[in-house]
Each structure stands twice: as C-alpha cells, then as structure tokens.
C-alpha cells in the first residue's frame, strides 16, 4: 500500500492530477492544510476527471494532526536537497511518501527530524524541481513496482487493429 501526503499543496491542478494517480493505483491521498485552493475547486475536479469516487482522501488541519492520526512508520520525505536517491530505497512493504508545497517544499524542521528518510529524484543541476504531480507519480510507481504491483491489473488486451 502507498500513502501520498501533500503538505500545504498550492496548485489545484497538481492535487487533482495526484488524486487521479491515487485513483489508478489504489494509493490513499492525505492533504495537510492550509491548502492553496478549495477542495471543490473546478481545477482540482477537472484534473482528477471522473475518478474521484475511487480516491480515499483524508484532510488534516496541520502536520501535527496528520502525525497524531497516522504516526511516522514507513515515512519517506521528498526533497531536492536529499543526498539519497529514491532508487536506493527499500519500499517493498507499505510506504508513505510525503511531499511539500510547490513553491517551498517541506518545512526545514521536518527535513531535519527525518533526515535519514529524505529522498530525491535525480535531475540535472540546472533544474530546481520536478512538477509535484510528476514527482508523486514517479515515486508511487517505484514503490508499487517494488511491491510487485500488488492489486493492480497486470495484463493488457490489445486488439490486432490497435497495434497496426
């Protein structure tokens, strides 16, 4: 199982796209306030398409409430500042992936507290960061790959005319 935690997300389209990733993978989505948008915002809904009924979404007033209700077992924080790459992580069991807001990332106190559980996605040095929804999808699918894509459809059914 994968849990995705967004701490103070600001851009509704990103949260909607991440919700769609959650819908397609069975991951749970945790949103930590303050949010930079209203959860009913049309941009959020549009980005998630008609998949919202498939999303297990939970909302928290602050980071402290999130930790009080969920703890920190299997928690991994994402930051461009981490020395460790996500490819070096063992996510073969349940995992919680925490992402910060688009403009500033996760608060420094969180990164310091969980320094040994911070990971990054490799990229060129000239770039500041990946899009939040892309980063969430990359790490979610890596965790699911390590978990053997448990619970996901593992076959396709292309018709002859589709492959031509």
Predicted ranges, named:
Residues 1-164:
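Post-transcriptional modification and biogenesis factors for structured RNAs
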């Amino acid at each position: 199982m994968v849990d995705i935690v967004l701490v103070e997300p600001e851009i509704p389209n990103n949260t909607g796209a991440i919700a769609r990733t959650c819908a397609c993978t069975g991951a749970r989505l945790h949103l930590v306030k303050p949010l930079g948008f209203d959860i009913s915002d049309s941009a959020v809904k549009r980005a998630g398409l008609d998949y919202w009924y498939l999303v297990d979404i939970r909302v928290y007033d602050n980071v402290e409430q999130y930790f009080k209700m969920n703890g920190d077992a299997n928690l991994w924080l994402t930051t461009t500042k981490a020395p460790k790459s996500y490819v070096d992580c063992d996510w073969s069991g349940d995992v919680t992936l925490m992402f910060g807001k688009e403009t500033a990332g996760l608060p420094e106190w969180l990164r310091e507290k969980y320094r040994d559980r911070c990971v990054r996605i490799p990229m060129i040095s000239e770039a500041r960061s990946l899009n939040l929804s892309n980063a969430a999808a990359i790490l979610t699918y890596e965790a699911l790959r390590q978990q053997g894509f448990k619970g996901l459809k593992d076959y396709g059914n292309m018709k002859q005319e589709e492959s031509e």
